[in-house]
């Protein structure tokens, strides 16, 4: 009897010890206003909890001060690992200095956090490849290799938020592919707005993009019966949706719609691809990225090295950040069913 009681006491003590040692993971997402961040947050929370971690998931409404405050609270509450998709990649140094002093490990999620040596690892997609996929699509479908400067294709360019480090890779990858055709006169941007700064959109705002596209249409005289516009480069889907809204309002239809690129395969953009008002999107399966982060968290919690496949690309100003890059995939009207529906990413009813 005494032996049995001792065994029970020992078991209870073990369970209690396990509970007190449960690792707390803080997950800080930038906003709930974009579909992809909801999916990222939900996927991570579900997988981390299934792996036995306590998860504190917070969304910051694209408010830098709010995100900073939420991270401060995570540190106060004893979170020992932070996963952060920063609103502004350069705005978190102060709070992350505190994290480093407390021995908290920091994983930058999809957006690299700049100028902080507290960042331990980075998990993202191959963002340069995202841009090259978009650029290559335009080269192929505008038939730029077959054109001459006497018959150029006309394009306007849009990218994302200037405080998001990823735009250097999205935009840079696309421009690297397109630059030879700009240089030879085979590809022309009538507005002359081709620099990253000129094409950037604060907070990836659909509304701001729509306004800029409307202004370009008015200034350049674009339209089905007006000046020719063959394509609009867009770094992601929230940007593409603003472009599409403006072009539809200007009278374009699926029969004469300029080629509009995108990224994320957001539901509205998939619907636009089906309708012929967006040409393509780069699919980044957030389930894959979330699963990779869970592996990284698990390795950190167990004191081992997490899986890394890039130690050259991402320098945040304090040095190269060891990274894991997931593969982006091309998507359009021809393959969205196998890519998104058959894989279980969406239900068919989501995009009907």
Residue ranges and their predicted role:
Residues 1-17:
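Sec-dependent N-terminal signal peptides of Gram-positive bacterial secreted proteins and lipoproteins
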């Amino acid at each position: 009897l005494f032996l049995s009681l001792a065994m029970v006491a020992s078991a209870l003590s073990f369970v209690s010890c396990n509970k007190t040692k449960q690792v707390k993971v803080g997950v800080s997402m930038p906003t709930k206003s974009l579909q992809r961040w909801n999916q990222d947050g939900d996927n991570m929370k579900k997988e981390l909890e299934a792996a036995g971690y306590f998860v504190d998931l917070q969304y910051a409404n694209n408010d830098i001060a709010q995100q900073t405050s939420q991270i401060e609270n995570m540190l106060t509450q004893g979170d020992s690992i932070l996963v952060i998709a920063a609103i502004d990649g350069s705005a978190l140094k102060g709070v992350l200095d505190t994290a480093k002093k407390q021995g908290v490990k920091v994983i930058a999620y999809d957006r690299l956090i700049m100028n902080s040596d507290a960042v331990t690892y980075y998990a993202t997609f191959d963002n340069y490849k995202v841009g090259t996929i978009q650029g290559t699509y335009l080269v192929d479908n505008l038939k730029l290799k077959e054109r001459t400067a006497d018959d150029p294709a006309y394009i306007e360019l849009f990218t994302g938020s200037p405080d998001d480090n990823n735009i250097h890779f999205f935009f840079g990858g696309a421009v690297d592919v397109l630059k030879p055709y700009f240089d030879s006169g085979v590809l022309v941007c009538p507005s002359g707005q081709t620099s990253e700064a000129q094409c950037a959109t604060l907070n990836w705002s659909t509304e701001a993009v729509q306004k800029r596209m409307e202004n370009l249409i008015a200034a350049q005289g674009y339209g089905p019966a007006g000046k020719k516009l063959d394509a609009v480069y867009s770094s992601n889907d929230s940007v593409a949706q603003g472009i599409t809204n403006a072009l539809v309002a200007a009278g374009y239809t699926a029969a004469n719609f300029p080629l509009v690129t995108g990224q994320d395969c957001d539901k509205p953009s998939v619907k636009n691809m089906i309708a012929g008002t967006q040409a393509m999107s780069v699919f980044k399966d957030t389930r894959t990225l979330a699963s990779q982060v869970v592996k990284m968290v698990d390795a950190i919690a167990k004191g081992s090295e997490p899986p890394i496949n890039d130690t050259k690309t991402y320098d945040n100003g304090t040095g190269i950040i060891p990274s894991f890059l997931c593969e982006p995939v091309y998507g359009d009207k021809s393959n969205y069913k196998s890519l998104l529906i058959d894989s279980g990413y969406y239900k068919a009813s989501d995009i009907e």
